[in-house]
């Protein structure tokens, strides 16, 4: 018979592996139960759609570009496209009193 050397590292690795395995099994069991419940309650439920290109929303439809909306900047008084508002505010507010 060979005698195994029990060290703090081996014990801590065993405890960590047991904890991680238990956590993963718990998460998988909960998610599986939740999915089964959703399928039972809503049989026609579609899952969200993922399109890696980024041109479709979560429902699989084309994203609407709201480039026709303009917002009035109270700081500088300009009308700014809604698509560019965040970038404009960053520049506009960082200028501050330099006007």
UniProtKB/Swiss-Prot annotation:
A zinc finger (SGF11-type) spans 71-92. Its main location: nucleus. GO terms for molecular function: transcription coactivator activity; zinc ion binding. It is found in: Nucleus. The keyword Nucleus applies. The keyword Transcription regulation applies. InterPro entries: SAGA_su_Sgf11, Sgf11_N. One of its GO terms (cellular component) is DUBm complex. It comes from the Eukaryota. GO terms for biological process: chromatin organization. Keywords: Activator, Chromatin regulator, Metal-binding, Nucleus, Transcription, Transcription regulation, Zinc, Zinc-finger. Belongs to the SGF11 family. The long N-terminal helix forms part of the 'assembly lobe' of the SAGA deubiquitination module. Functions as a component of the transcription regulatory histone acetylation (HAT) complex SAGA. At the promoters, SAGA is required for recruitment of the basal transcription machinery. It influences RNA polymerase II transcriptional activity through different activities such as TBP interaction and promoter selectivity, interaction with transcription activators, and chromatin modification through histone acetylation and deubiquitination. SAGA acetylates nucleosomal histone H3 to some extent (to form H3K9ac, H3K14ac, H3K18ac and H3K23ac). Component of the 1.8 MDa SAGA transcription coactivator-HAT complex. SAGA is built of 5 distinct domains with specialized functions. Within the SAGA complex, SUS1, SGF11, SGF73 and UBP8 form an additional subcomplex of SAGA called the DUB module (deubiquitination module). Interacts directly with SGF73, SUS1 and UBP8. This is SAGA-associated factor 11. It comes from Saccharomyces cerevisiae (strain RM11-1a) (Baker's yeast). The lineage of its organism: Eukaryota, Fungi, Dikarya, Ascomycota, Saccharomycotina.
């Amino acid at each position: 018979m060979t005698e195994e050397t029990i060290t703090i590292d081996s014990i801590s690795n065993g405890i960590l592996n047991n904890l991680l395995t238990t956590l993963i099994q718990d998460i998988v069991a909960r998610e599986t139960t939740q999915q089964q419940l959703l399928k039972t309650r809503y049989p026609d439920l579609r899952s969200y759609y993922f399109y890696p290109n980024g041109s479709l929303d979560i429902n699989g439809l084309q994203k609407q570009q709201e480039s026709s909306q303009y917002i009035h900047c109270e700081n500088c008084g300009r009308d700014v496209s809604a698509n560019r508002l965040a970038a404009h505010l960053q520049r506009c507010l960082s200028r501050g009193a330099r006007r």
